[in-house]
Amino acid sequence: MEDEISSFFESSPPQKNMEEILENLNEFIKLNSSSQGGRRIVCVTSGGTTVPLEQRCVRYIDNFSSGNRGAASTENFVKAGYAVIFLYRRGTCQPYCRSLPDDPFLECFEFSDKTNIQVHTSHLEAVKMAVMDQQTAVAEGSLLKLPFSTIYEYLQMLRLIAEALKDVGPCSMFYLAAAVSDFYVPWKSMTEHKIESGSGPLDIRLAQVPKMLSVLRSNWAPKAFCISFKLETDSKILMEKATKALRKYKVHAVVANELSTRKEEVVVVSSSGNVVVRRECDKPESFVEDNLIRLIVDRHSTYIKESHN
């Protein structure tokens, strides 16, 4: 497995702006680490990874992930006092923007006269809260946003973040809500230019993406609290696969969610038993992530306490 992981990174295209990303990351961690600012730090991954089919990518394989869970969870982590490294897919849902329309620039604003625009009265409160909450989180140094698109970018940045958080130890957490591709086209076997469509049917052989969770737990950030996710469309196999992932990767909990009910309830699978977490149906503005993050924060507190004993 380690050979496969090494081979994946060695053959991946280099991450753009790596030095700038690392500088921002280290500055953020220094500001918020327990020896400096006293905050716990969580890396929330969000959205889905793309699989390019050409090196100069025109076509790619994608998944449906909108990033809603990662965005909602980030808001709750900030509210709970965490500093959040938000590793997100470009173009997916952002923290504090979930109450805005799909096209906020065009739907939230109107002309006040021929030259000036203003927020439409029907969206005024939502825009005000979104801007205020976002700016407060950034100004207080509790939110760092890092974008990705491809499977290559995501895994290179996840490794970078994990290694940077290694010294933070138990006060760091990984909340891995991103939908990571299981299969990909190795970079060296890709055509450079756009695949021609006039040559008939297209046959593509996909390789399996090496499972990085095990090396994150064992090498990159072994003392960090780690939460992974398992999504299935078949509820009959969901719990079995979540339990298997818990044992195989030695994470602290697996959040099991079934596609059709994922916005209403999830099951947190851990060595101490399974806990069903539901959205509070009597509160229209509530989300399942509200209760989920409360539970995860409590579990993290216990983990930190036990680590210091």
From Swiss-Prot:
- The coding gene here is PPCS2
What is the purpose of this protein? Answer: Catalyzes the first step in the biosynthesis of coenzyme A from vitamin B5, where cysteine is conjugated to 4'-phosphopantothenate to form 4-phosphopantothenoylcysteine.
Q: What's an example Gene Ontology biological process for this entry?
A: coenzyme A biosynthetic process
- What InterPro entries is this protein classified in? CoaB-like_sf, DNA/pantothenate-metab_flavo_C
Reaction(s) catalysed by this chain, per the record, are: (R)-4'-phosphopantothenate + L-cysteine + CTP = N-[(R)-4-phosphopantothenoyl]-L-cysteine + CMP + diphosphate + H(+)
What EC number(s) does the entry state? Answer: 6.3.2.5
Organism of derivation: Arabidopsis thaliana
Which UniProt keywords are given for this protein, alphabetically ordered? Coenzyme A biosynthesis, Ligase
Recorded GO CC terms: cytoplasm; nucleus
Family per similarity comment: Belongs to the PPC synthetase family.
Instruction: Cite the Pfam families for this sequence.
Output: DFP (PF04127)
Instruction: Reply yes or no: does the keyword Ligase apply.
Output: yes
Molecular functions per Gene Ontology:
phosphopantothenate--cysteine ligase activity
Name listed for the protein in its UniProt record: Phosphopantothenate--cysteine ligase 2
Q: Broadest EC class?
A: ligase
Pathway listed for it is: Cofactor biosynthesis; coenzyme A biosynthesis; CoA from (R)-pantothenate: step 2/5
* Subunit structure, as described in the record: Homodimer.
